[in-house]
Amino acid sequence: MNMIYKVNHPISAQQFIELLDKSTLAQRRPTDDKKCMEGMVNNSNLMVTAWDGDTLVGVARSMTDFHYACYLSDLAVHRDYQKRGIGKELQRITQEQLGEKCRLILVAAPAAHSYYGHIGYSNNPRCWVLGRDDRIS
């Protein structure tokens, strides 16, 4: 396997959807909402992808200021390519793009919660989420 990693290489919303469908992430993303998925792909300012030839097999999709914080919003690896270090490499390359003081932040999927501590992340119990239908009171 000769994996090629690319930084900010354009991908289509359809390629992104197909990858999510072949990973575990589609369960938690609106893959049936093409407009939303297009917005997710087109408005990310840091995307690292993994390719096996012409086949997209992994993605780390982030929003960042490159100096203080980088939110890694999606990390997906095709199920046939999992447990080969691709996800870890996507994160390493993402971190490589950031300034020396920039933190990498993510919300772990329930099944992946223990994985992130194993590769060096520290758990932060102070995270809060305001859902789309929730309102500031």
Give, region by region, the residue ranges found by the protein language model.
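Conserved active-site alpha-helix within GNAT-family acetyltransferase domains
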Residues: 100-106, 110-136
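Short amphipathic alpha-helix that is part of the acyltransferase structural core
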Residues: 1-34, 127, 137
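Conserved beta-strand in the GNAT
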Residues: 49, 55-64, 71-76
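Short, flexible, glycine-rich and Lys/Arg-enriched loop motifs at helix boundaries
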Residues: 5, 98-101
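A short helix-loop-beta-strand connector motif used in the catalytic cores of GNAT acetyltransferases and
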Residues: 38-49, 102-103
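Alpha-helix N-cap/helix-start capping motif
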Residues: 10, 66, 109-110
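Conserved acetyl-CoA-binding loop-helix of GNAT-fold acetyltransferases
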Residues: 77, 83-96
